């Protein structure tokens, strides 16, 4: 009984991909990868399974979201929860030589366990890049520009890249509230975009009115109305001021790339990915309630694999990108040749000719079809080679 109950069910958060959606994903994937490769990024693959003690613990994904299993030797493995940590492992162990930046790209599925069915997938496809070994703001600008170019090649026209600096937020919070525990509470409000809760929490803190005002002023440092001078005046530490300088330099570089029209600065931007150390960014598109992609600088991650190197990168959620594109569920154009036994050779030759022309062609024996009317609705056009005459 239990076996029959789950016969057509899938594990929580898992999805099937039907032909029409697969075709859309393939087109989007190919367009993005072609663009990424023109920037000199090289595609790599990493294993679906990684050791929990290395990649699993280094990943910024919460432990309860990891799919865990044991191998034959009793080692705990995880299905990769993101691609940044596996690529950091690979770069640190096999590829990176100090002073020689790496430009790597990937197209892979990642896995994150869901506690309940809420419409969020437990497996999804990501396309992204990692620039490893280059600590300059120019590298951040390049990564963001690659992402924008790839999204445009995929067909996305209306989107916004929101850019911030986690170093700025951390510097401001630590100099006012004094310790990481209190700062993490404030960051959580910002990550959840719970600005009402943030304001109420700030007002409840035992701080001077001046410091409370500084924390509240942070919420106004975004969009076209803010200036970098305002951001710099709000923070006192050198680390915070350097973060503002980084963003100024980044803005100038993005203007040179000609992509500043889709970029906006938001000094409140934080991420749930704990390994980010500097500039970070998210991509938002119309009609999609979540970021379709994100990225940033993670200069301390490779150090966890015993190889110190700066790095920056991005990842795009293909499922959310397709939602943003609003692609119609049109099936790909596939022709069909329906033939009878006496015209089998003729049908094979015709199909071969059409395929040489780049067309997609199904070859179907008439005896294998039960309902010709229903079958014919799947293909266009259909060529019939039956008996001694040909109908179209």
Swiss-Prot record:
What family is it from? Belongs to the class-II aminoacyl-tRNA synthetase family. HisZ subfamily.
Q: What else is known?
A: This function is generally fulfilled by the C-terminal part of HisG, which is missing in some bacteria such as this one.
| GO molecular function term, any single one | histidine-tRNA ligase activity
Identification of the protein by name:
ATP phosphoribosyltransferase regulatory subunit
Where does this protein act, in terms of pathway?
Amino-acid biosynthesis; L-histidine biosynthesis; L-histidine from 5-phospho-alpha-D-ribose 1-diphosphate: step 1/9
| Keyword set, alphabetical order | Amino-acid biosynthesis, Cytoplasm, Histidine biosynthesis
List, alphabetically, the InterPro entries matched.
aa-tRNA-synth_II (IPR006195), aa-tRNA-synth_II/BPL/LPL (IPR045864), HisRS-like_core (IPR041715), HisRS/HisZ (IPR004516), HisZ (IPR004517), HisZ-C (IPR053846)
Q: What is the disulfide pattern of this chain?
A: none
Coiled coil residues, start to end:
none
Which Pfam families has this protein been placed in? HisZ-like, tRNA-synt_His
Question: What are the subcellular locations of this protein?
Answer: Cytoplasm
- What are the record's GO terms for cellular component? cytoplasm
Q: Read off the PANTHER family from this record.
A: HISTIDINE--TRNA LIGASE, MITOCHONDRIAL-RELATED (PTHR43707:SF1), HISTIDYL-TRNA SYNTHETASE (PTHR43707)
Query: According to its UniProt entry, what is the function of this protein?
Result: Required for the first step of histidine biosynthesis. May allow the feedback regulation of ATP phosphoribosyltransferase activity by histidine.
HAMAP family named in the record: HisZ
How it assembles, according to the record, is: Heteromultimer composed of HisG and HisZ subunits.
Q: Looking at the keywords, is Amino-acid biosynthesis present?
A: yes
The answer to whether the entry has keyword Transcription is no
GO terms, biological process: histidyl-tRNA aminoacylation; L-histidine biosynthetic process
